[in-house]
């Protein structure tokens, strides 16, 4: 396998799943990881994972559907991720901020997204931390 770099969301997903597996099997997380050939080999991007698979350097890696498909690779859905825009209030209230939100919430924008990437149903909803 090829792993993702420590600190990436994908690596957190992998490690969480491996912790669950270790618990189910009644073994330590470190034991599971030590038996996975390539666990300590890291890629910094989804594209790097796909390239390693495409070049037959590894059998498997965790990445996103759009990158796998653009490389003609098969994939198995593991999880969905959510991302947020973090903005200053002054940006949100500016014309460019309003324009950005209008684009992100538009049907036209959503129809242009590659397979495997979708707009969140609550896109445009504000979460205030004041």
Model-derived features: positions:
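A ligand-binding cleft/hinge motif common to bilobed small-molecule-binding domains
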Residues: 50-79
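Short, glycine/charged-rich beta-strand-loop motifs at protein surfaces that mediate ligand recognition
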Residues: 38-42, 49-51, 84-90
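Short beta-strand-to-loop elements that line the ligand-binding cleft
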Residues: 25-48
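Conserved mixed alpha/beta catalytic, RNA-binding, or beta-rich assembly cores of soluble enzyme
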Residues: 5-10, 43-46, 51, 57, ...
């Amino acid at each position: 396998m090829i792993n993702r770099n420590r600190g990436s969301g994908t690596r957190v997903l992998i490690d969480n799943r491996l912790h669950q597996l270790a618990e189910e099997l009644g073994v330590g997380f470190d034991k599971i990881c030590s038996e996975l050939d390539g666990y300590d080999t890291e890629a910094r991007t989804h594209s790097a994972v796909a390239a390693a698979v495409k070049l037959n350097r590894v059998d498997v890696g965790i990445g996103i559907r759009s990158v796998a498909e653009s490389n003609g690779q098969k994939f198995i859905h593991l999880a969905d991720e959510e991302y947020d825009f973090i903005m200053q209030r002054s940006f949100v209230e500016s014309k460019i901020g309003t324009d950005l939100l209008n684009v992100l919430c538009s049907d036209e924008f959503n129809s242009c997204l590659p397979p495997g990437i979708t707009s969140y149903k609550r896109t445009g909803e504000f979460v205030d931390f004041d």
